[in-house]
Amino acid sequence: MKNIAIIGLSSFGYYLCEALNEHGFNLMAIDLKPDLVNQVKPFVRKAVIGDARDKNFLMQLGISDFDTVIISV
């Protein structure tokens, strides 16, 4: 199954996590706001609070190993 990272968990990002989880994708969600990250935890394999504008942060998460990265800002 594909590994997908979703950056930005506003309404669109939240619903992406929910829908893609229903289809069995392996998901990682990233946002700066802890409350948004906590809301998607039931739908994702990994939920991370952090600044996705920071290249080093993304590299530490292994972003290059994902099949798809969706930016929802």
Where are the model-predicted features located?
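Cytosolic regulatory regions of ion transport systems
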Residues: 1-73
